[in-house]
Every structure is written in structure tokens, then in C-alpha cells.
Amino acid sequence: MDNFFNQMVEIIKLNKTIGQIAIKAEFESEGTRMSELLRLKEIAHAAEIPMVVKIGGCEAIRDLLDCKDLKILNIVAPMIESRYASYKYVQALERVYGECSFKPKTYINIETQTGFNNLEEISDQISGFVDGIVMGRVDYVGSLNLRRDSVNSQRILEDSLKISSRCAEKNLEFVVGGGISADAVPFLIEINKVSLD
């Protein structure tokens, strides 16, 4: 193992002590290459932390096949905005993992105002088929024509709590994503308070 690899592993191990729970890669907007994903998978394995991969769309079969081959533990579909997109994601998961004994945890991203407005029908569609919903705050504030630093605002907190509440009703996990930094700690504490009540 090279020095950079070892440094990355040590940083992740340190981060785990303060709450890091996974390493994320994206085929979607980051355009992660397979060689990069393989290296990240090695680092994650050495640091004993799971991987999360955001695929390129609701029906990104090639991405799902790659995730299946690598036994990626968590998969997120981006920009889910309608019941139909949710349906296509569920169908794609069934097509790739239907006969497989290995099943990853699966999530959708609600990261636009349109997706938020269609939350009820989307959550109805995925309940029982997908594990949860991720609130993608950076793209969400962009869809509202707000600045990136609005991710921790009261408006976004209220919308996140609405998604969290709907997830609880439909027995889905709720995850806050996008713009996670030290500045997000008060926001996350508020989410946790309500989620644990």
C-alpha cells in the first residue's frame, strides 16, 4: 500500500470517531470512473466503512450492474421527481438484483422543489421496495433559486422535517445530504431532535 492510501485510511478512521458513516462516490454529477471507484472501494474496505454510490439516473442499469459486481452496500438514485421515476428505479433494481442473494440498501434523492411537491406519491411508490429518502440540500436550494449557503436555513429545515415525517409514516429511512460540514451541526441536531421524538 502506498503512503497516500494509508493517509486516506487513517483520515477516514479518525472521521468515523466523529460520525462519518460511509464514503460516497457518484456516477451522476461527479462522473466517478471505474478505476476511481475500485480505489475508493479498497480504501473503504481498509477503513472498515461502507460505500454509497449515487447512480446516473433512475434507470441507470449499467451503473447498477457495476455496483452489483463490486457489492456496493448503498445505492442512491438522483433527482427523483415523480411517481414514474420512482417506478422506473424500483423496476431497474428488480431487473439487476431480483434473483441475487446480495441486496444493497437503496435510496432515492429528493433534491428539487418538484420532487418535494410530489413527495406523497413518490413515497407511496417506493414504500416496501426502497429503504429510504435522502434530502439532497444543495440541489434543492438551487431548485428554489436560493444560494448554496441556504442549506442550513429555517426553510430547508422545515422542508427536511416534512420529508422526515413522511418517511416515518411510510417506514422509510431519512437521510440528510448535501452541504454537510461543521456549519450543518445545528441543523442536524434539530433534525435529530424531531426524528427521535
Predicted stretch roles:
Residues M1-D197:
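Expand to "…catalyze enediolate/carbanion chemistry for C-C bond making/breaking, isomerization
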